[in-house]
Amino acid sequence: MNAANIFRNCVQAIRQGVLIEREGANDKEFHFQNWFRKRLEAMSLNFDSPGRNTYPDFCLVHSPEGYELKGLAYPGREADYDCNSQVPRGEHNGRQVFYVFGRYPTRPDGNRYPVLDLVLCHGSLLNADNTYEHKNKSFRGFGSYGDILVRDRKMYVAPTPFALAEGTAHRNTLILRDTENPGPGFVPVGTMRRREVDQIVVTYNFDLRSNCLETTTAPNPNAGLEHIFVAYRLEGDPLDPVSLRPREHILSELESSATCGDE
């Protein structure tokens, strides 16, 4: 597993003041990716270069691991992020998937600015199901003349580790499954247990007359199953604890974020 060493390299770069460099004010997508790319290159890790629609963003060549990057402006939206058409997961096409969340200043005074804090986590912290397959569907027949096409293009929004875990803000944190050992140089600062819900959404229906969306649930075959994660810090960093927020607090913050996004 390369995740721990990649995290170490990222933290060392942050400590050394290695800045994000954007090409211009309109570069809102690739600047953090480019910063991370340089960390992989510094480690001489071979990877497939990311494309606009590839998932995850970086796939290692000699190890079945992938890294999905999410840059977040701070202060700003931090409770959730747009997954677009890819539900977060911990495994994809035989690769273990890790997510890298980095926050940077919302209004930098130039095109070079620091990584404020960073979380590298296993994707199963965000969602434990690796079986769901996203597909876009459509039908024709809508409208007065029955010739308008309706596309069903699902877009997903998931919580960030900053919303899930207390103690991640303003720190650099590695979060792994409890079965994974990061090796020497890492100090555990918290254990988190995410419990699968009793009912999961299996269908939804959208009424074109009322613009109402309704969901149908079914029993979760893994109801009550706990997924255990351990948070680590690199030696030399602050060791204040990391803990999972209560579920009601997480949902409340996500609802608040969704309401602000709809305004």
Predicted feature residues:
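Nucleic-acid endonuclease domains
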Residues: 1-56, 61, 71-263
